[in-house]
Design a protein with these regions (language model features):
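N-terminal Sec/ER secretory leader and immediately downstream segment
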Residues: 1-66
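Exposed alpha-helical structural elements
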Residues: 2, 35, 39, 55, ...
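Regular secondary-structure segments
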Residues: 24, 102, 106-109, 160, ...
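Short, charged, amphipathic alpha-helical segments
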Residues: 37-42, 56, 95, 122-130, ...
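A cross-kingdom marker for long, charged
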Residues: 144, 148-175
Length: 175
């Protein structure tokens, strides 16, 4: 499993957010979620947030309208935030919600990018380079209005190189 390659709490929390977003997307598309749920059990255990999985497993009402779906997701997010606060997990919460928000933005724009269960690690998928460049563009645009985001752009920049290097190393090892 590639999840073992996520070393820090922050990476795990971000990956957890990405997988939670994908879980919702797959549920909405009526696609199987077993792989992703297995990864989430692992990540939520590592992060000591077992309660999060119960909140995220709740399904939106069948045939929900866009408004109903949006309301459901907002409520789900609020429940998650409250539970995180009660359990003193604010640090994990920020990273997790960040991962979730970015993944939703990307999947809405390109539904083909849903992470395929545990086959591809949330941190190192072949889609990740695409994701990173999209995030870089978004942060660069927003930095004009939110100066704090400039720092984020600088943090993200070296990531695409790292992902590319890791993926190249993997490919050569696979041969």
């Amino acid at each position: 499993s590639k999840v073992s390659e996520l070393n820090t709490q922050a990476q795990k929390a971000r990956a957890c957010g990405i997988y939670f977003a994908d879980l919702n997307v797959l549920k909405a598309m009526k696609k199987p979620t077993t792989d992703i749920e297995n990864v989430l059990v692992k990540l939520t255990t590592d992060l000591d947030i077992p309660f999060a999985i119960d909140i995220m497993k709740e399904s939106a009402p069948a045939n929900a309208s866009k408004e109903e779906l949006s309301k459901f997701m907002k409520n789900q997010e609020n429940k998650l935030i409250d539970a995180m606060m009660e359990n003193d997990k604010a640090d994990v919460e920020l990273e997790l919600l960040g991962g979730m928000a970015v993944e939703y933005a990307i999947v809405y724009a390109n539904p083909g990018l849903v992470v395929k269960g545990d086959a591809i690690s949330a941190g190192l998928s072949e889609n990740m380079e695409k994701r990173i460049s999209i995030i870089q563009q978004i942060t660069a645009d927003l930095a004009k209005y939110y100066p704090d985001l400039e720092q984020l752009g600088t943090t993200i920049a070296p990531l695409s190189g790292m992902v590319a290097t890791i993926n190249t190393a993997r490919e050569s090892k696979a041969k």
